[in-house]
From Swiss-Prot:
Residues 1-185 form the RNase H type-2 domain. Keywords: Cytoplasm, Endonuclease, Hydrolase, Manganese, Metal-binding, Nuclease. It comes from Campylobacter hominis (strain ATCC BAA-381 / DSM 21671 / CCUG 45161 / LMG 19568 / NCTC 13146 / CH001A). The keyword Hydrolase applies. The gene is rnhB. PROSITE patterns: RNASE_H_2 (PS51975). The keyword tRNA processing does not apply. Its cofactor is Mn(2+); Mg(2+). It is found in: Cytoplasm. Its EC number is 3.1.26.4. Endonuclease that specifically degrades the RNA of RNA-DNA hybrids. This is Ribonuclease HII.
Amino acid sequence: MKICGIDEAGRGPLAGPLHIAGCILNKQIEGLKDSKKLSEKRREILYEEIIKNSTYKIVKFSAAQIDKFGLSKCLKLGLNELVDFFAPFEVKIIFDGNSKFGAEGFETMVKADDKIKEVSAASILAKVSRDRVMRNFDIKFPFYDFAKNKGYGSKAHIEAIQKYGYCEIHRKSFHLKHLQGILEF
């Protein structure tokens, strides 16, 4: 039975979207592994190869949607959408991690992005697509250096928030304890 791998990117950042990708490989691709263990250049090369040689879908949630529904609900909605999309393919669906976020129709596996090539491919799809969005946001909001930090809470990013406040892609529901009282939404 073929496998559909699912992984996400953008669960922990202070800013930007959440991307959840599902992928069925139609051809073997060399060099697949967890996206975090690949250079940005290598991820970009593999991303292009994956989209040419797979059936895939990427579900995206904006910072505003994450604030409105909550991260867990967005994950549940995204996982359900991917399960529905891939159901006709009669595949075994594996999601990286140990939580189903209330969704059904798939298995979870810790470190699946290291163990299962389809999950590695999904990891790359989610990461590269999200990183591209963050590079575009860097042009619109240059003070935050989103091209470099991808919205994560680096020291420079937190200092930029302290200096310039939050921008429209910051997750209002992700309060930084040491910034409370300094900044208001």
